[in-house]
Each structure stands twice: as structure tokens, then as C-alpha cells.
Amino acid sequence: MAETRLKEILAFVNHKGGVGKTTTVQSLATGLRRFGKGYFGRGADGKERKPRILLVDLDPQVSLSFLFGWDQVNSNNKPTTYDALINQTPLPVYKMQEGIYLAPASQKMVSIEPFLNQMAVPRKALRKLLLKPLQEMQGTELADEGVNSILDAFDYVLIDCPPAMSLLTYNALAAASSVVIPVQLEVLATKGIAEITNAVIETREDLNEDLDIRGLLEVMSNDQTKATRQFKEYLSKKFDDYVFDSYTRRDTKMVEAQAMGTDIFTYAPYCRVGQDYERFTKEILESMPQ
């Protein structure tokens, strides 16, 4: 990986829905663009460049794709991650914003497992795609630069996993360099962390020896409740080496931003959760592999 442009492939995993996983992917992607200048060297023009990010949506709910403007209804005939996975064809990437590309999900992914199970190594379908030439679906920006591989075209790949330890999630683990686990500080959301860490260990032993846990991110935190403080203490004691210093708080501004079809940094960058995701983005940047 050191000889390519790509710095990290991050898989965002939690087998419970509604824990801020997709929101975290959206916010990190836009945060990397907003705060990443100065971390990624200089372009051909000699200027410091911002990172280019690829989002891979593996969630049949298609939420990440929707947040970045993918229209499921009017895009039925356009190739998605689903098509690439079952046919092992180049991953279709669509430019959604300046510097942010999307390999969109499809609701058909809810029934993808029988197709994947027909493959020689079902858990490596996505990993193989990331090593293939990409399929640029809009414009020729990447082709004009003379790059056609994901490793050379992007600085970051962010994978949004379904809220289950499914075959799609294991595909993400086999393809990723690291795992980010967004954790809401409540009983049902925290009890599955051990299952995720065990899945990481299993994948590391069988398919991806370089896979690591990038960190646990506390999301939608409320320090004013006793229960939240107790769960913070639990995470610190049990997973201290893996807990990010940054965390995010509940804030209605995030709901408003997404309802308006935009991200928190565009809508309200100085609100509480905007500042929280700024800190998280900078923590990722400052600990980025070189």
C-alpha cells in the first residue's frame, strides 16, 4: 500500500442499526475534504491537494448512497455495487461531489448471499473488486489523470456495512485495512462489540492478516446521564487501547442537515456535533498511516 496513493480502507461496522454508522461515514468523508489539505502532499500544479475519497455502500438500506444524492428510483438501470459483486465486474464509481465518489448500494443486496456463496471464496468478492480497474461512470477526471485503479485513484476508501455480521460485512473486513466501530452508549449497542472484535480476529487469521481495529467511536453521547457515564467507564476499562479520544454528542442539527440533503460541515459546522466530527476527522488524519 505504501507504493500507491491509497492510505486506508476503513470499514464501519456495527451489527445494530441506528447507532450513527452511516452518519459517521458521511461526516468523515466530507470532513476529510474540509480538513485534509496539508496531509496528502502536492498535486501536479505544486499546490497542496485535498484527499479524494471513495465511498462503498454495502448496506441494502442504501442510506449512505441516498445521503450523497443517489436516486434509487431513477437509477434502476445504472450499475451498482451489487452488480459488480455478483458479476465480478469493475466497481462502478460515480462522482457525487468534488473529490467524493460513490459505489452505490442496491436494495437487491438483501438477497445477495446465495450469489456470493457460489464463489470460491465468498468473503473475498469485494477485495477482488478493489484490485480490479474501476469503472468511471460520470466524466473522465480519473481517466484524464491516467489512473484506472482504486489504489491509485483514491486516498481513502470508506465502506458502510449493513447493520449485521453478514457475509457482506465479512467482505468488508476482508477488504479493509482497519475497522471503525461506532458505539452508542447503551446496553444493546455495546454488548455486540466483542462479537465484532472476534470477527476481526477471525478475518485476520483466515483472509486479511493486515486487518486492524482503528478504534471505537462513541456516538450520540450524553454525558449528563449516569448510564452514559457508566458505559464510558466500561469502554475505557475493557477496550482502552481502541477508544478514540474524540466522540460525538446528540444534536438536532445533524437531523436537520440530512433532511436538507447536505452534511453537517456545510449546514452548521460550528454546532456541537459539527465540532465533534471535526475533532474525529482530525484524529483520523493525525494518526493516518504514512
PLM regions and their residue ranges:
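P-loop NTP-binding core
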Residues: 1-290
